[in-house]
């Protein structure tokens, strides 16, 4: 069972991609986002219902519905990756609250749109490597 869960997480996080090359991705980390004014105008800013955690996932997903979202391999970011929601109960509560809001908004187990986004990105990135 543990192996099955780990495999689903690996696929969900797209860990098998080569992040040393530019890739179109459906979800971007909020620690560094650059976007066109046009995208913000059409898609809006961060959803204020998410106080912490998953606000970047929600925003980049909305942008990806209408625009390309790209991970640029040449960029470098230093992030104090602490996973506080794994260490502090108060942070875990915030994380779980945001996760519930996110899944209520986008779907829980069967998120067909996310599955389709991932499929298209896989095809697009594979085609770039073949060419």
Task: Give, region by region, the residue ranges found by the protein language model.
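Short, flexible, basic/aromatic active-site loop/helix in glycosyltransferases
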Residues: 1-25
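Short capping/connector residues at structural and topological boundaries
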Residues: 10, 30-33, 82-83
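Aromatic-residue hotspot detector
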Residues: 12, 50-51, 102
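A short, conserved alpha-helix in the catalytic core of glycosyltransferases
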Residues: 18, 26-45, 49-76
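Alpha-helix initiation/capping motif
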Residues: 24, 28, 52, 85-92
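Active-site-adjacent helix/loop segment of glycosyltransferases
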Residues: 58-61, 65-131
């Amino acid at each position: 069972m543990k192996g099955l869960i780990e495999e689903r997480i690996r696929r969900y996080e797209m860990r098998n991609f080569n992040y040393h090359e530019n890739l179109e991705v459906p979800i971007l980390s909020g620690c560094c986002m650059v976007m066109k004014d046009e995208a913000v105008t059409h898609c809006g800013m961060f959803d204020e219902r998410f106080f912490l955690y998953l606000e970047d996932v929600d925003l980049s997903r909305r942008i990806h519905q209408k625009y390309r979202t790209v991970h640029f391999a040449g960029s470098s970011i230093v992030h104090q990756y602490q996973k506080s929601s794994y260490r502090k109960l108060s942070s875990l509560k915030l994380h779980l609250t945001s996760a519930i809001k996110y899944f209520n908004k986008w779907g829980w187990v069967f998120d067909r749109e996310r599955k389709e986004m991932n499929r298209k990105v896989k095809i697009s990135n594979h085609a770039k490597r073949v060419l």
